Amino acid sequence: PQARDLAAAMAAEGWMAITGAGPGIMAAGIEGAGREHSFGVNIRLPHEQEPNPFIKGDPKLVAMKYFFTRKLELIKESDGFVVLPGGFGTLDESFELLTLLQNGKTLPTPVVFLETPGGTYWDEWESFLASEIAPRGYIHDHDLDLFLVTEDVDEAVAEIRGFYRNYHSIRWTGATLIIRLRTAPTDAELAQLNVDFGDLAATGGI
């Protein structure tokens, strides 16, 4: 119900859902958003999987032969990510997404790992990153800020909405990085940005 409820809440605000088009959580996301607000990116496998009935036959359903092209579409065409507990494929997609964000190889986007009520899947996973991966220097402590772990659907929705409250988009023009905002920062806010992040600028300031 979490995937369905979250997708329904986002669709009500004009968002569209894109999932792997399979059964279970993937189907729940499309059911919640509704066929008219959904895309499906299925994978062709010898023993599975048929697209779920909520998207089957829809022109917004595509089928991929390779997992890597499927991941490319899911990441490239999404403005936010909500990940629920799953198997190797879920973890593979999650780690690739975080690696791309960590290294600036994809656009900044909000990422939420949605825990089942009372569950420990993502909490234990996050603890493993914090206690085993970060202390060894394989990731930085601040890499854990790339995502939010919660079991609250409303908090997940708020995280995605809040990310785009002022941020609009980002792009490179030659050697210049342009960040588009809905509201320009005040002089005081700009001064603080230069204090906190001015070292990111090759010359001058932000």
Regions found by a protein language model. Give the residues of each.
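Active-site/ligand-binding-proximal alpha/beta "capping" segment
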Residues: 64-112
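SAM-dependent methyltransferases
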Residues: 146-147, 153-206
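Glycine-rich oxoanion-binding loops at beta->alpha junctions
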Residues: 1, 43-76
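Conserved thiamine diphosphate
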Residues: 73-83, 132-151
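Short, acidic/small-residue loops that bind anionic groups at enzyme active sites
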Residues: 38-49, 84, 98-125, 141-142
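Glycine-rich beta-alpha loop segments
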Residues: 1-43
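Glycine-rich, charge-decorated loop segments at or immediately adjacent to ligand/cofactor-binding or catalytic sites
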Residues: 25-30, 119-133
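Short acidic-hydrophobic, aromatic-tinged amphipathic segments that line or gate anion-handling sites
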Residues: 60-69, 145-156
